[in-house]
């Protein structure tokens, strides 16, 4: 008994001494205050797809709260928030998830193709940044706006389309814009009196952006599912908007799907792809598009480019045992010729 008490006493003394020693730093270097830089690397990231050069271009961020998903889910808001916290998703000053807005540039060697064009100078409470950063990212990546000859919007929401025009002038003067007929029917052709009050502002933004290109005959149309230009097939992913499309690129046996807004929050919708979002024009169709597309994407093991995935928005899908999906982002590596 005495031996046990002695052992406990010695252990306690050692713990006390150790804790006191660790409470104070061993060394204190002389202070050397250096101003923080508080800047980030330029907003682009590049990979090769066969012979095609693919560049992700950061345009800014939107603040998306779990409330936007709660009305389209069997999960409670608290459960949705838990999914977000589990992924350590960064938050904005207003408490929403800091959600990237990403466009993609594909240089095929024959054409310089921009998929989506960012928000430009459109103002909306969900946008974190006052102005889009697409052009700054594009120039940091070594390209100029006037070099782009083809623009493929996945749809005509402001964060994907308004960046084609700033203050009524074309940002991409030498580009032709290709729109699906299904998207055109709503955004460009619907009489204003037939639009809902909620839609009028968003439609006005889309029409203002398209106007200078329409005036100069720089807009062409296709049907969802068609090969839009050689080597680029449109993939119907309807629901988010009536003519929402992805675009599939293939080079030397490697394939990439640019899926636009198929997913808005990877923490929620990868685990529960049945969950829709308030921005969907037709949540039932959007849910169906996602549930149909994700298994096929995972099975084919193709590269994915997503507009609202964590930057650079490039990676692959794996099927999880619980029926959800795991997002596997690309890793940094140099471009080797």
Regions found by a protein language model. Give the residues of each.
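Active-site metal-binding loops of divalent metal-dependent hydrolases
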Residues: 59-60, 117-120, 156, 182-183, ...
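Cap/insert and terminal regions of metallo-dependent hydrolase folds
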Residues: 252-337
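Active-site glycine- and acidic-residue-rich loops that bind
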Residues: 157, 233-247
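Short, conserved loop/helix-junction motifs that constitute active-site signature segments
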Residues: 168-173
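Metallo-beta-lactamase
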Residues: 21-143, 147-159, 181-236, 253-260, 328, ...
């Amino acid at each position: 008994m005495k031996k046990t008490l002695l052992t406990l006493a010695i252990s306690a003394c050692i713990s006390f001494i150790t804790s006191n020693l660790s409470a104070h730093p061993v060394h204190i270097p002389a202070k050397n205050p250096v101003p923080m830089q508080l800047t980030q690397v330029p907003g682009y990231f590049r990979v090769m797809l066969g012979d095609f050069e693919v560049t992700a271009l950061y345009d800014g961020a939107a603040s998306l709260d779990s409330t936007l998903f709660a009305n389209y889910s069997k999960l409670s808001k608290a459960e949705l928030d838990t999914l977000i916290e589990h992924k350590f998703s960064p938050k904005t000053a207003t408490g929403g998830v800091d959600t990237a807005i990403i466009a993609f540039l594909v240089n095929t060697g024959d054409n310089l193709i921009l998929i989506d064009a960012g928000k430009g100078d459109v103002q909306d409470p969900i946008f974190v940044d006052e102005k889009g950063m697409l052009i700054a990212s594009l120039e940091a990546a070594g390209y100029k706006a006037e070099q782009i000859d083809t623009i493929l919007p996945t749809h005509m929401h402001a964060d994907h389309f308004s960046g084609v025009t700033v203050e009524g002038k074309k940002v991409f003067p030498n580009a032709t814009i290709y729109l699906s007929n299904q998207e055109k029917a709503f955004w460009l052709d619907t009489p204003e009196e037939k639009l809902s009050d909620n839609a009028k502002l968003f439609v006005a933004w889309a029409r203002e952006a398209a106007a200078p290109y329409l005036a100069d005959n720089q807009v062409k149309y296709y049907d969802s599912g068609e090969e839009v230009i050689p080597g680029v097939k449109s993939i119907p992913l309807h629901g988010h908007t009536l003519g929402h499309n992805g675009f599939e690129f293939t080079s030397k046996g490697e394939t990439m799907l640019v899926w636009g807004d198929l997913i808005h929050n990877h923490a929620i919708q990868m685990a529960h792809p049945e969950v829709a979002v308030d921005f969907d024009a037709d949540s039932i169709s959007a849910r169906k598009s996602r549930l149909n597309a994700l298994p096929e994407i995972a099975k084919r093991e193709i590269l994915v480019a997503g507009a609202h995935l964590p930057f650079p928005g490039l990676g692959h899908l794996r099927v999880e045992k619980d029926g959800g999906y795991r997002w596997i982002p690309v890793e940094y590596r140099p471009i080797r010729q």
